[in-house]
Amino acid sequence: MKIPASSPQDTTNNNNNTNSTDSNHLSMDEHVMRSMDWDSIMKELELDDDSAPNSLKTGFTTTTTDSTILPLYAVDSNLPGFPDQIQPSDFESSSDVYPGQNQTTGYGFNSLDSVDNGGFDFIEDLIRVVDCVESDELQLAQVVLSRLNQRLRSPAGRPLQRAAFYFKEALGSFLTGSNRNPIRLSSWSEIVQRIRAIKEYSGISPIPLFSHFTANQAILDSLSSQSSSPFVHVVDFEIGFGGQYASLMREITEKSVSGGFLRVTAVVAEECAVETRLVKENLTQFAAEMKIRFQIEFVLMKTFEMLSFKAIRFVEGERTVVLISPAIFRRLSGITDFVNNLRRVSPKVVVFVDSEGWTEIAGSGSFRREFVSALEFYTMVLESLDAAAPPGDLVKKIVEAFVLRPKISAAVETAADRRHTGEMTWREAFCAAGMRPIQLSQFADFQAECLLEKAQVRGFHVAKRQGELVLCWHGRALVATSAWRF
């Protein structure tokens, strides 16, 4: 439901107004890399749970009004600075990298001699497990998986071997039901490790930055009209730790005569209570530094599943932008209903960022096909990671454990749960609902090319495909960003 617009109180005047022509000549360091400064977004977080600020250990309340989460927090200005480098001592055992995992299984990163380097025939056993799951022969799947456990004991070796290990673990979690445990809030240590992993990933690979900058540019392109409302509302279905909004705030501030107003509604999982407090605190502080008016609200995923877009507060006069990724489609029972409900919101633009290979695998209805496609996709991601980081680099292992492994687990669980039900791909659902793709601007191309030039990792290149701007690794799409309009 939309409510009448009320002009938010203007707390400040805009510092500078920079036209789009000048911005095209910004250097790479000024325009692109400056925007993902994790040090300015996240303060240093200690590994010890007891070191967490009291404000982040407090309760977490929900209200019925607008179905939003209102995190309780207080700004702690005494948090020390974020570390620039991960030290090996931070992860002295495999339990640090794989929380809750039994130490006797030998899944630590140090078990390098346990990997079968004689060939890749372990893939055959992996596919046998998939075939057993697809035919509902779950006991036989367990037998084959137990044999596979003896051959793939740690995520070491070549990219395909490491990917096979993560996919084998995901299959094991699905078969045992361990991925269906009751909701558990993330521990302070887990949050710290994830933040560090994301920061380091952004530092060595162009993949995260490509996702953020292309999405932000698609949003900015939709707001470039002279008649645009100064009030921008972004509905984000995968906000993460919110670092991408630093870039967006900078651009809105520079391009808006009035300083701009940004409102974000993030749909988040139930276990992300602590993360939402961090996101709100840091983005609010950053907005104050940028002198931009800013609001952020959170809606529980469970609430959205029940109420759809009625769970979100919309205000008349705002320009609504919806930012989505495959994550939302994994949670919902069907893509078609989501898109039909989205149509009623009448967003200015819908930005879809696919960094999980969904463009090519979703909707097949075949668990085997989706599994093999996902295995190939993440093998390519790991290969690109190897090219960006030196062999044996600890940062690479942390990125795999805290960024890529959860994505693999979620992809396998979704494909397994839907193995008997084919459905439209997201693109088919968009087109069926009357959505049409919008060409991304040349400036988005410019940013992407500059990013690759800065990263200097050979093998990446930028391409265009069916209206998408695509980051490729040796011809295989790793990230595809597209903008759509009803």
UniProtKB/Swiss-Prot annotation:
- Region annotated Disordered sits at 1-28
PFYRE: region residues:
320-410
UniProt keyword annotations, A-Z: Nucleus, Transcription, Transcription regulation
The record's subcellular locations are: Nucleus
Tell me if Repressor is a UniProt keyword of this record: no
Which ranges form a coiled coil?
none
Q: Which tissues and organs express this gene's product?
A: Expressed in seedlings, roots, leaves and flowers.
**Descriptive protein name:** Scarecrow-like protein 15
Summarize the protein's role. Answer: Probable transcription factor involved in plant development.
> Hey, which family's this protein in?
Belongs to the GRAS family.
MF annotations from Gene Ontology = DNA-binding transcription factor activity
Motif VHIID, residue numbers? 232-236
Q: What is its main location?
A: nucleus
Please tell me one Gene Ontology term that the record gives under cellular component: nucleus
